[in-house]
């Protein structure tokens, strides 16, 4: 890699400060590779008086994102002849046309994945077609030459125990897509290597639309030399930025970080992300940073089979179906935090999403006499009833419509999706109407349910959390029994298993000793905002329940005997609310 550094150092377009060099990283990890170092003794006095020192200036044209790749490919001067220019571009267009025709292409289309696809195309054609020199050099000497290991390298085994994590599920499906797209031109190891090399080196680089505009867009970008800078949150002494006048990428050193040590080389550290989400960093970069005082995060994803087999606090609520119908992300955000001299994992209950997660654990009404939630196993008739009210001409086909809804709902409840994209008419919330001193029931979305329940003056949040804690403790034991031994001997798998076992042991011990597990009980404010929760998983071609284990479906009964008032006191209001869904085209 020193040769790569020298190559770019000799470029007339790239500015590299004379103090900057490339050496094996000081990070205590045999696979940490190389890092950027500065020799403070080579700084000028006036530089040391500034707030920052410019270590690198990489012109936009020397970086690689979708826009710059298209610009390079569209420049005839990047090719030896007009014929080679046309030949290469025709080949790439044909390859892209075939790729875009794949039925799953758009499902996993992101800017980063498209960037990866371009480099995979370059890898398949580079021995027979001309490609711009900048692309060719970076592909051969950086992407295909670096040693890198991410979750992609062992994704098949990781998916066995962690397929319920959306990130792992998405990674596995992305690999399947790339295998189908490139199976006859790239071997599996090259596909995995290129993916890992690009995903672990991509930076989110802002770009100004034009010199007169104040608007910026962000692109997944590969930036030569800058991408050798390692992450170390607590030792961060540099950051990347852009020159808004021309969108050059800059690496800037915080001068204060070197003023105390001017005699020996110092490694340059940047922050890949302001939030240290350990699971995401492990999947993307293949490592997790050590805890050094700043909050770290982990989002636990519930095994879907565990949710489906757990009866809920009232022994009647199927948590898997509840969360699916209510579009509630079946994950628990955790935060690693130092409190009173001890570093521990806590459940981060300070987010709105956590309030939704607790909905099925809210205590029953009137000392358990009235269940908080009611599931309508014949909700296909509710759908049919509303459908026929919105479309009166459909009444003569009511039985057929009911059967269609029954089949549709059965399929959606059984598949691997984390959500059911239908109106939430399967579950009814019972709540206290304090104005009229009575109990009401209605179909409601999760956000509105949280708002309604917060209006109940006597809502027992302590009991709600207690019931959730009991459920979560059982889940921890379930996970401990599932991951007795890793299904892979890869570095990433080893770190992943060790980290989850640490979390399980820490939280189980806290629960068993009646210690605080909810972060809000600490009455402190997080020093860092956690990342957004991972997206809801979609896997509609996978059936979670085998046919022999499914409960027998109810026979379609006469609609005249179905009374919506069994499940809602606001039927007419709900008919109006969901009318758009039921209107026939």
Curated annotation (Swiss-Prot):
EC number: 2.1.1.59
Keywords: Cytoplasm, Methyltransferase, S-adenosyl-L-methionine, Transferase
Residue ranges of every copy of the SET domain listed in the record: 18-273
Keyword Acetylation belongs to the record: no
MF-aspect GO terms: [cytochrome c]-lysine N-methyltransferase activity; histone H3K36 methyltransferase activity; histone H3K4 methyltransferase activity; transcription coactivator activity
Listed GO CC annotations: cytosol
Stretches the record annotates as SET-like: 186-288
GO biological process, one term: positive regulation of transcription by RNA polymerase II
Keyword Cytoplasm: yes
UniProt-listed CDD domains: SET_LSMT
Compartments reported by the entry: Cytoplasm, Cytosol
Domain of life: Eukaryota
Catalytic reaction annotation: L-lysyl-[cytochrome c] + S-adenosyl-L-methionine = N(6)-methyl-L-lysyl-[cytochrome c] + S-adenosyl-L-homocysteine + H(+)
Similarity comment: Belongs to the class V-like SAM-binding methyltransferase superfamily.
Additional observations: Present with 2940 molecules/cell in log phase SD medium.
Functional note: Methyltransferase which mediates trimethylation of 'Lys-78' of cytochrome c (CYC1).
Record comment regarding domains: The SET-like region, although related with the SET domain is not detected by any prediction method.
Protein name, entry field: Cytochrome c lysine N-methyltransferase 1
Species annotation: Saccharomyces cerevisiae (strain ATCC 204508 / S288c)
